[in-house]
Structure formats: structure tokens, C-alpha cells
Amino acid sequence: MKSIPKLFGTSGIRGKYQEEITLELALDVARALAKYIGGKNKKVVIGRDTRTSGKIIENVMSAGLQQSGCDVLLLGMVPTPVVGYATLKKEADAGIMITASHNPSQYNGIKLWNSDGLAYKQDQERTIEKLVYEKDFNIVKWNEIGKEYDISSFKDKYIDDIVAKSGINPLKPLKVVVDCACGAGSYLSPEALRRAGMNVITLNAQPDGSFPGRRPEPNEANLGELMKTVKALNADVGLAHDGDADRMIAVDENGNLSDFDKLLTIMAKEFGGTVVTTVDASACLDIQMQKIGGNVLRTPVGDVHVAESINKNKGTFGGEPSGTWLHPDFCMCPDGLLSGLRIVRTIQKNGKLSKQLDAIENYPTIRQKVTCENSKKKTVMSIVEEKFEEEFDDVKEILTIDGVRISFEDDSWVLIRPSGTEPYIRITAEGKTQEHLNSIEKISNEFLNNII
């Protein structure tokens, strides 16, 4: 019996348009989703980012859903969090976001959402894959075909609701530069900040799926213009999004890109209680949360894992160092726009972003990768799980939920995990001192090189 091909990765289905992401696949995924949620009279929300292939994929998926008896609610071009929120508020049975997030313009993808605004879990994705593989669809009669509705006006409600939820003081305006990457947040993110009373300067805020202003990945290599502009205009903060605006990265008032882990920690401290992050996040989060009586739970890499843990453990906040943050008091969908508003609120409340970041201790880190054929990864990781801890004598805690993460008595740590997309084993480590980090790095590399 043939194994069912894997379509979903860590964040939906993703690939190059007309290669991995074909119109035939989009049609079949829509039909499979319709079958999964019950078909006739069910409602599905669809949104898309600015990519040039988005509209035609939207058309095909809408047709597949209607062909299966579902009604389709079209948002048009919107950030991913609008899809999650609309699915929740419109009491739809599912949501679809057509996006490849931070990937280049020739890519696109499909991400699915539950009725509560939570991304599809792995077991749900496996079911969709099985239905697609077996072509197990229910096509309805001519008089049972679903209808299509335009709900693009919902965007205004979303903006009003995130502004209200953010806690921003409109009587204390700050100068904010926002770089939208010509992505799905190009209108909504600046508009939300303006409605919140901020003085807004925009960069790359013209929707364009070829991403002419900068690459959609919000990292230091792509944010030079934002950093220069913040400093030149004496702005209070700069905000940057990826292609679908489910992420947010900040630049401080001096034009320096914020350390991702520290930025996550600043926001987590605002909520307190139980916060959730991934295995690759810095120990600075744990240390700062301990100081205020909170605690940190860790999950495998991927926002859906963070969301599941928040739900299960009544978390107050969650996120990944990449800038993907979840605000459970609003919606379980990662939301870069609300994240940006709330960072502005912390500056109003606590002062300059640079000072907030400087108050969190720096720890030296390394991020490396060791070449390992995909066929060897399972064997290598089983040896890591069984033997790696024996290389150290000051182990405090071991996590094996996504690779192997070893924490040491001084709060240093090392994570070894296989890349999900490339032929590498990744080493991430953080040391309380440079000397300890150097020792961890040497031991980790020697161990891996001996078993690969």
C-alpha cells in the first residue's frame, strides 16, 4: 500500500506556483476541506495576500467549495489574522488563507483555520491529505451548489477591534514608521495605527505581489531602509511585517533592530502568568518571567503548537522569536498588526524601547547547521536522544518534544534538531558566559560529526 504524500509543512501547504502549488491541488484541497467539515450549507472564509497567483487560486478554491455545497465568504486581499478573526466572528466552519508568508513572490501556499480561529492541527492536516490522495469528495447536484458572498467590509471591524483591544492611549501619540513589505498589511497596519492616534510614516505600503521594495522576510538584511528612516525622522519606533502580516519585528528609536527574543520577552512580561514559546527561544524569557512570578511552557517549532499549548494550559500569551505572536484574549491566530499596536503601547507605558531591551540581559548565542542527508536524520536523532546528555555533567533539564534541548544548571542550553526542509541538523545554543558557550559548541559539533 502506497503511503499518502505529505502536503502540509510547519505552516500549511507551501511551494512554487505551478510546481508544488498547482490549480489542480488547490481545487482538490478545497473539495477535501468541504468533505471534512460536512459539505452542504457549511460556510468557509477565504482571504489572500498580495501575490499575483493569489486571485486565481482563490477562484479555484471557491469553485471547489461551492461545487461541494459550501457557501464562500470572500475577504479579498487581507492579512492572515483577518482570516482567523473573520472565521471566528462570522461563525464560519473553516477559513482558508492563500499565502506563502515570507517566501519569495513565485511561491504561494494554503493555510487552513478552524471555526475558533485556530490553525489546523497535524491530525486534521493528515485527514485532508488522505481525502486529497484518495480523491474522496462529495460533489453536489446543480440545485445544491453553494453561494459566494463578499465580506471585504469586515476589514473595518477588524481594525476597530484590534485598536480597542490594544490598550493604546490615543491622547499620547508616538511617531511610528511601519514597513509593510508591499504585502497584505499595506493598508490595514498603517490604518490601525492612525485610528489609534499615532503619527504614521509608511514604507512599502503599496500592495504588490512582486515585493519590489524589499524581500518579505522581516530580518536585518531586508530592513535597512526602515532602520535608517526611524533614525533620520527621530521616530519612536519602527515596525515591520512579512508578506501576510502575521509577524511583527520592531526597530528601536535609535534605528537598531530589536533582538527577537528580547522583544518577545518584553511583550510576555506585560501579560504575566503562563506564556508559551518554542524550544528554540532564549532562556532570557524564562529568567524574566520567573522574576514576576510567571512561568514558561515550550512547544515544538510552529505557531500551531504554541496555540494548542495556550488553549490547553490557559496561557496568557504565546509566540516564537521569529515575531509570530498569539494574543488569546483576542483570537488564536498569529497577529502582526495587534502585536505592533501592543509594542507601541509598551513604549507609551514603559518608555523608550531601547531601554526596555537593554534591561534584559544579553547571552551569547550560536546558530549552526551540520550537513546530514535526509535519509540519515532519523537514525542520527535517535542517537542524539539516547547519548547526547552523557557528554555533559551539569544537566538540569532535557526536552525531547522537537529535537533534543538540554538546559544546564547556569541556565545555558543547547538544542539539536533536524531541519524540516533542508539536509541539515541544526545546533542552537545559548551560554551564560562565552566560555561555557564555546564548550557547548565544541562538544556538540564533535558529537554530531562522530555519528553522522
Swiss-Prot record:
Its cofactor is Mg(2+). It comes from Methanosphaera stadtmanae (strain ATCC 43021 / DSM 3091 / JCM 11832 / MCB-3). InterPro entries: A-D-PHexomutase_a/b/a-I (IPR005844), A-D-PHexomutase_a/b/a-I/II/III (IPR016055), A-D-PHexomutase_a/b/a-II (IPR005845), A-D-PHexomutase_a/b/a-III (IPR005846), A-D-PHexomutase_C (IPR005843), A-D-PHexomutase_C_sf (IPR036900), A-D-PHexomutase_CS (IPR016066), Alpha-D-phosphohexomutase_SF (IPR005841). The lineage of its organism: Archaea, Methanobacteriati, Methanobacteriota, Methanomada group, Methanobacteria. Keywords: Isomerase, Magnesium, Metal-binding, Phosphoprotein. Its EC number is 5.4.2.10. Coiled coil: none annotated. This is Probable phosphoglucosamine mutase. Belongs to the phosphohexose mutase family. SUPFAM superfamilies: Phosphoglucomutase, C-terminal domain (SSF55957), Phosphoglucomutase, first 3 domains (SSF53738). Binds 1 Mg(2+) ion per subunit. Activated by phosphorylation. It holds the Pfam family PGM_PMM_II. It catalyses: alpha-D-glucosamine 1-phosphate = D-glucosamine 6-phosphate. The active site is at S101 (phosphoserine intermediate). GO terms for biological process: carbohydrate metabolic process.
